[in-house]
């Protein structure tokens, strides 16, 4: 199970043996943001990216999503400074974001070097989304529907922590194994893998939908919460974004976009 890497390459070109990805790919996260932005008619983006490899990967996913959902990136900017923004954000960021008018600022700063300071400091008073601001995630403590609040409280009572994305996808991996063993009444790895990767497998995971895995890449199909620190804003896929198989496949790379063809390998 991959519960650690958001890499799009692992779902499209660098196809590993026996992969099951419970963590969503970057493309799934940014496609959720793209759907919401399209639905809200926030069609003009200013993209600000960091200089780290993971920032560049997130920025590429944002650009792909913008093209996919008919959005325009009016300018791309790279934050490559080592300024202490705790002291200078109000002076430097308005000038840095002064450009042709935009309606949404999208940030690619996975490490958190500058993104937290972009909000409320842009040249135009516009919302911020991406790795900071309105953020697409696998899970967040503000997800409380579909029985999720009870699960959140159980974890908090037992371990004194809130469930986050990494904890959630690790839990989903364990639930996947438990569900497969229960349904197949087998502990054979090949039998379990083939069942999990079939259309017979479904998993209840507190997201309001039955979840399963994409047979070609091993990626878990799942809704993506869009959150701010204290509330759930939306949970794509949204109504109106259609797909011939399932609207969950409007998030991330669909089968024709991936060269992976997952099958069981014993070694």
Please report, for each region that a protein language model flagged, where it lies by residue.
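Extracytosolic ligand-binding ectodomains
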Residues: 1-267
């Amino acid at each position: 199970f991959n519960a650690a890497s958001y890499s799009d390459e692992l779902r499209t070109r660098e196809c590993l043996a026996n992969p099951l990805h419970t963590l969503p790919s970057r493309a799934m996260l940014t496609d959720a943001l793209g759907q919401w932005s399209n639905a809200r008619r926030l069609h003009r983006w200013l993209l600000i990216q960091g200089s780290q490899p993971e920032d560049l990967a997130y920025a590429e996913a944002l650009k792909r999503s913008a093209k996919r959902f008919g959005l325009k990136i009016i300018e791309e900017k790279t934050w490559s400074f080592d300024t202490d923004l705790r002291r200078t954000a109000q002076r430097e960021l308005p000038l840095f974001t002064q450009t042709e008018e935009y309606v949404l600022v999208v940030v690619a700063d996975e490490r958190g070097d500058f993104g937290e300071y972009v909000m409320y400091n842009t040249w135009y008073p516009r919302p911020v989304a991406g790795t900071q601001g309105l953020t697409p995630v696998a899970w967040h403590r503000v997800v409380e529907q579909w029985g999720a609040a009870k699960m959140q409280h159980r974890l908090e009572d037992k371990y004194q922590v809130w469930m986050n994305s990494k904890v959630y996808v690790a839990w989903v991996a364990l639930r996947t194994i438990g569900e497969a063993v229960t349904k197949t009444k087998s502990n054979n790895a090949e039998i379990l893998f083939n069942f999990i990767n079939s259309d017979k497998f479904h998993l209840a995971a507190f997201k309001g939908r039955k979840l399963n895995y994409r047979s070609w890449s091993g990626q878990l199909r799942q809704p993506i919460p869009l959150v701010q620190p204290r509330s759930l804003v939306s949970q794509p896929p949204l109504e109106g974004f259609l797909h011939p198989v399932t609207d969950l496949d409007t998030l991330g790379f669909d089968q024709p976009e991936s060269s992976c063809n997952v099958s069981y390998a014993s070694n």
